[in-house]
Every structure is written in C-alpha cells, then in structure tokens.
C-alpha cells in the first residue's frame, strides 16, 4: 500500500508547500498503521471524528501539530524527579534546559514571579496549590512554633495532632452549581474537601452573578485561610482587585483558578483588575483549553511560594512528564505571538455573537450573556433536560456538554442547562458570520426537541426526539461549515484509510 507520506510528498512536489510538521505527523501515522494497525486506525478515526463535529465544549480546543510533535519523542523515557538543576536522578541536563525554558517562558508570558510547569493536569495543579498554601501558611509556622526544623522531626503524637489541626483550617470557594469546579473543595467526594474545612459561596439567584459584598460577609464571618476565585461554568469576568481586598481583610491567601480563561489573560483580553496575576498569591491553570497546549497543568505564584513549588516532588508529585513539558514550552511560546492575541480577542467576540443570536431566538442565557469564551443556556423554559439537549446536538454534529445551573432541581447528571464555548471553532478560523449560523442551527434544534416520557409520565433521562427533516437540515449546515474550516487542512483525510 502506498504510504500516507508518499501520497503527501507527491501531492506537494514542486508546489513549495511542504510542511515539516505534516511530514512528521504523517510519518508517525504511517508507522503506527503498519506496525500497530488497531492503534493507528483508532487515531485516524478520532481525527475523522473531530473533523465531523463542531467542537463547542468550552474546555476543549485544538493544539498545533508542533505541540503534538513535541510530545512524541524519547523525552518520555526520562525520569527527572526534582526541579531544574536539582534532581534526584543523574543525567538530567537536557531535561533541565527544557523545563527551565518552559518556566521562564511562563513567567514572561504571564508576568509571574515564579512558576511550576510539572503538574500533569489542572487537578494536579490545584492540589499542588493547596498543598503549597498548607505547607507555607499552616505547617511550617506550626513546626517552627513547636521548636522543630522540619515536619519529619516531629514525634508521632505531635505529628498526628498537627494533621488534625490542619484539617480544621477553612477554605472558601465557589460552589459547583455556581460555576466552581470539583477541585474547589465544595464537593465532599473530592480530595480537596478532605484537606481543609471547605465552605461555598454562591451566585446571586436573581442576577446569577457573584456578589462581592456577600462573599466579603461570608469571609469576614468564617475567616478562611484560603479564598478561591475562578470558574468552570461562569460566563462573566471577575474583579481580582476586589477579591484581593476581601482576602486581605480576613487574612486569607487568594488562590485563582484560571484554567478556563488563561488564554484570555495571555492574549491580553483580561487586563487590569480582570487579570489575576498582579493580585493573586497563587494562580493555577491547565495548559490546554484557551491556551491551546497539551493536556497538563501550570502553577504561577508570588516569589514567597517559589521554594515550595520547587518541591512539588516530593510534596505531592513523583516524576514529571518531560515530553509534555516540552510541548507546554512550545504552546507558551505560541501564546506570545501577535496571532495568538488576535485569536484570544476573536474568541470573546465569537462568544458574544453567539449570545446575541441565541437571545434573538428566545433562548435564555445565564447572567444574560457573556464576557468571556463560554455561555450557558438555561433549558428550563423549553422543558428539555441538558442531557437530552446534549444527545440531540451530538446527533447532528455539534459537541456541547450538559451543565447544571444555580439551584438546579434536575441534579448533576440530568441538568437543566448546556455549556458552550468558542475556543475550538475560533482556532479553526471561524468568525462572527459563522457564529450566527452556528447559533441559528443550535436554536432550531433545541426548539424542536420532543422529550420522550416514560410510563409514569416523567421526562426520560436519555431520550429525545428530533424530526428527521430538522436533523438532516442541521447536519447539512454543520457539514457545510466544517467543509470550509477543516481541522488540520494540511492532513488529507482521503489518504487516511
């Protein structure tokens, strides 16, 4: 069989269009298809799948071929526990150089005083953040007060007493239904809730916005050690100067989780008091989502946390992933370009266009609109559960995710809303005109879903009905859009057999 690479090289021969990234990508697929056919075919099928849907899950995006290629190499074979130039293993000088460059790039991009690029995910970054705060603000002062040098010097009885004491310190963060994340401690099954006494704050049910006066009142009453700000499903911006003042007034550390909007900070969309870096003590993020990097985490912090972050291993990590750190460095460098800044601004413009067209179609949005990359549609008035809406949109080629809303009576599994985002479609090059078309398609589908009832007359958790005429029209309109804005256009799907 003629290889993908052979076909590609023949096609571009003499056209001056050769892409080294495409050559490398196709060579890798060729090898896998030949040597490990089932794995190679699954990768090809995933590419086809991603090219056949409008990806509107707010936490997803498309990384560049450069980012992907940086992960596929022998760096994965190297153990490098520790921090740059201070490892628990020998022969790490090349990994040191890569990680150091990644750290310095992160600090320059965000204007941060210190950075740790080792976390494998956003959840790991959040765990490192809370462990760093506990170590810095609770554990170390307690050990010193007891007259010991390190926690390892404590006798067993005093160590157990200190552990019990640490779990009583308070953490105040956004609840899950108000747009917070599982790792913000307000969900008891998550490990974060077991490290501290975690308390929630909620959005105002009338405005669906965070009320800083209410947050300040709760903080003053409970005097938490940590105040968490950030979101995974909240469509407005936050004022970090105000949140910093609330934290200072109650003696709390301000930790900001900017996993969803890090790309908007890097791209210069969130500036001034909307940029958390100058105000927060610790900032965490993923490196995918709006940053368009590999799946991974990143922690940025004030200088006083630098030593603790450099001890991520053994604090809560073992060996980092040097191949992913290399890809993070590539993504962070891409985020420093003018093109990325244009991209970040277009992400928000596209979200606002979606919101405007949805509202013209009579759909209700939480908070009445959006100031960032996402929006949440309240489906209550349509009588359509979020899970059914998710399924029906998936069936016509639009990927979204069901999402709970404040005081959601339907629970976390069924939900009363759906969350949508524009990062991935913007990466494909779509603009406001395309967003109008997308919004009109979605609105028409949502308004024509019939909910199938069970024998007792209650709404089904998994089934909805959409007429074939509406479904076919939606699929064709989606296909037309995807045909004009293909994912990785340099990769010819016709050769992927």
UniProtKB/Swiss-Prot annotation:
Enzyme Commission (EC) number: 2.1.2.1
Function text: Catalyzes the reversible interconversion of serine and glycine with tetrahydrofolate (THF) serving as the one-carbon carrier. This reaction serves as the major source of one-carbon groups required for the biosynthesis of purines, thymidylate, methionine, and other important biomolecules. Also exhibits THF-independent aldolase activity toward beta-hydroxyamino acids, producing glycine and aldehydes, via a retro-aldol mechanism.
Cellular component terms per the entry's GO annotation: cytosol
Keywords, ordered alphabetically: Amino-acid biosynthesis, Cytoplasm, One-carbon metabolism, Pyridoxal phosphate, Transferase
Any one of the GO BP annotations: glycine biosynthetic process from serine
Root EC class: transferase
Residue sites binding (6S)-5,6,7,8-tetrahydrofolate per the record: 176, 180-182
Listed PANTHER family: SERINE HYDROXYMETHYLTRANSFERASE (PTHR11680), SERINE HYDROXYMETHYLTRANSFERASE 1 (PTHR11680:SF35)
Required cofactor(s): pyridoxal 5'-phosphate
Record-level Gene Ontology MF annotations: glycine hydroxymethyltransferase activity; pyridoxal phosphate binding
N6-(pyridoxal phosphate)lysine: residues carrying this PTM: 289
Reactions mediated catalytically: (6R)-5,10-methylene-5,6,7,8-tetrahydrofolate + glycine + H2O = (6S)-5,6,7,8-tetrahydrofolate + L-serine
UniProt-recorded name of the protein: Serine hydroxymethyltransferase
Pathway this chain belongs to: One-carbon metabolism; tetrahydrofolate interconversion; Amino-acid biosynthesis; glycine biosynthesis; glycine from L-serine: step 1/1
Family indicated by similarity: Belongs to the SHMT family.
Main location: cytoplasm
Localization: Cytoplasm
Quaternary data: Homodimer.
Residues with site note (Plays an important role in substrate specificity): 288
